[in-house]
Amino acid sequence: MNRRRRIYEGKAKILYEGPEPGTLVQFFKDDATAFNAKKHEVIDGKGVLNNRISEHIFTQLNRIGIPTHFIRRLNMREQLIKEVEIIPLEVVVRNVAAGSLAKHLGLEEGTILPRSIIEFYYKADALDDPMVTEEHITAFGWASPQEIDDIMALAIRVNDFLTGLFLGIGIQLVDFKMECGRLWEGDMMRIVVADEISPDSARLWDITTNDKLDKDRFRRDMGGLVEAYQEVARRLGIMNENDTPRPSGPTLVK
């Protein structure tokens, strides 16, 4: 039996060597973490749901011309992706005050922001991913000014698309986190959306009830995380309406 070479393991995913040069296999784990892994639990079925939801979103992004690393889903937990050079930044786009923004600026959670706000955080778990400015990014060489412009343009386009996508299924996109990477194609390089977009990396509230359908259910000990992710999958049309939560994990539409 061939054993794949493990390239990298993060808190929620594992990257393996891909079948072709320039590709990787991204495996979604069931691990739920918060506060940079200070809180950790394994929740059966979470990885399956995140794989399918992220696949659905990245497929749509590719379709409308927003470049991503996604190629195709391989199975319930894995997807084939293009190998990129990850830029060590988390890009957060906020539409509604919640989480750290509400806390740091004394805003009531749920306050609609005057306009969408883009923030950058340096990816360093040991430092709790500190917020950084464009000056920090260029001074330390994490990205060039042109790359920052490209990242911000991608963030705005992704936010516009996701806002409309979720609004159409009765969900408010409060905020989301995305990562970007450098994709080399011969001598040419372009910035693409990488990692994942799922309820793990976005705050999603039911428009009518304000019920949280995202990882805040784990962060805040609310329970019902898999059921919330299942609800997002159902509304997106990638999960059967009559499926019910089971310890062995959810059943998804193939």
From Swiss-Prot:
Q: Which SUPFAM superfamilies match?
A: SAICAR synthase-like (SSF56104)
The record's listing under Pfam families reads:
SAICAR_synt
Q: Name one GO molecular function term.
A: ATP binding
Q: Is ATP-binding among this UniProt entry's keywords?
A: yes
Annotated pathway: Purine metabolism; IMP biosynthesis via de novo pathway; 5-amino-1-(5-phospho-D-ribosyl)imidazole-4-carboxamide from 5-amino-1-(5-phospho-D-ribosyl)imidazole-4-carboxylate: step 1/2
Q: Which domain of life is it from?
A: Bacteria
| Gene3D superfamilies xref list | ATP-grasp fold, B domain, Phosphorylase Kinase, domain 1
Q: What class of enzyme is it?
A: ligase
Quote the catalytic activity from the record.
5-amino-1-(5-phospho-D-ribosyl)imidazole-4-carboxylate + L-aspartate + ATP = (2S)-2-[5-amino-1-(5-phospho-beta-D-ribosyl)imidazole-4-carboxamido]succinate + ADP + phosphate + 2 H(+)
**GO CC aspect terms:** cytosol
Q: Name one GO biological process term.
A: cobalamin biosynthetic process
Q: What is its EC number?
A: 6.3.2.6
Q: Which UniProt keywords apply?
A: ATP-binding, Ligase, Nucleotide-binding, Purine biosynthesis
Q: Which HAMAP family match?
A: SAICAR_synth
Q: Which family does it belong to?
A: Belongs to the SAICAR synthetase family.
**Protein's UniProt name:** Phosphoribosylaminoimidazole-succinocarboxamide synthase
Q: Which organism is it from?
A: Brucella melitensis biotype 2 (strain ATCC 23457)
Task: List the lineage, top down.
Answer: Bacteria, Pseudomonadati, Pseudomonadota, Alphaproteobacteria, Hyphomicrobiales
Gene name on record?
purC
